[in-house]
From Swiss-Prot:
Its main location: secreted. The gene is IBSP. Keywords: Biomineralization, Cell adhesion, Glycoprotein, Phosphoprotein, Secreted, Sialic acid, Signal, Sulfation. Monomer. Interacts with integrins; the interaction promotes cell adhesion. Glycans are attached at N104, T119, T122, N177, N182, N190, T227, T228, T229, T238, T239. Residues 1-16 form the signal peptide. Residues 222-232 have a biased composition (Polar residues). It is possible that the segments of clustered carboxyl groups mediate the strong binding to hydroxyapatite. Highly expressed in glioblastoma samples, especially in microvascular-enriched regions. Elevated expression correlates with poor survival in patients with proneural glioblastomas. Promotes up-regulation of genes associated with mesenchymal phenotype in proneural glioblastoma cultures. Promotes migration and proliferation of glioblastoma, breast carcinoma and melanoma cells. Residues 58-254 are annotated as: Disordered. A motif (Integrin-binding motif) lies at residues 286-288. It comes from Homo sapiens (Human). This is Integrin-binding sialoprotein. It holds the Pfam family BSP_II. The keyword Secreted applies.
Amino acid sequence: MKTALILLSILGMACAFSMKNLHRRVKIEDSEENGVFKYRPRYYLYKHAYFYPHLKRFPVQGSSDSSEENGDDSSEEEEEEEETSNEGENNEESNEDEDSEAENTTLSATTLGYGEDATPGTGYTGLAAIQLPKKAGDITNKATKEKESDEEEEEEEEGNENEESEAEVDENEQGINGTSTNSTEAENGNGSSGGDNGEEGEEESVTGANAEDTTETGRQGKGTSKTTTSPNGGFEPTTPPQVYRTTSPPFGKTTTVEYEGEYEYTGANEYDNGYEIYESENGEPRGDNYRAYEDEYSYFKGQGYDGYDGQNYYHHQ
């Protein structure tokens, strides 16, 4: 019994002494000086970048607080419940207002191009992953309606293009005779109908004038590049206007010699001697050009940093 008590007392003293040293070391390490000069990371894993920030975000750690883990799980469950409730609400609203839903679903993230069918599984991803694929028959009906509306729009556009082309042909036939397109439109009533606006008539007249110029130039000889103007005023090739206080150089000549006085010449014309003279006559500072710099500092090329005048600096202190 005595030996057992003695051993227990010795063991308790050793444990108390070791714990005392541990607490003392922790307090010393928490000081500001040791935090700056003696940085020893408390946890070995924090030395590595891929373990930092704190490990409570990762499920690998087994010693994290159970309350935090339970909190994360509960938050995930709440999010799932919210998603399911949103899905239920969307289903109810879809049953009540089908027309409004049809308008909203067409505003999807990826709009369909012309001629593409909306499949019931992949079409209408307007509310990403929340909206469920439902009522394939309604979706196909919507797709057929869209097709019909697109075909009607195309037919209207083709009809308008045909009318414009016919009007341009009539204007070209009358413009070749020398009469102006505006007068023919006013007299004969071609071009713009009674229901069209005045702006459309003006645009058609401009296109007709351009067509007149092209037809007249095509009738002339192919060797001549000169354009003749139409009797109604046409277009003449003009040279671009000169900028104020500038003189254009003659054709085929450069501006380096004759027009040198107009520009400020900032190059090194006086001191540019091809980097061949070490000490120039013009008082150029040493080291200003590369050749002089290389000649001046090539003395130190073969020597190490510790060699001065053939002596080792650290061995002669």
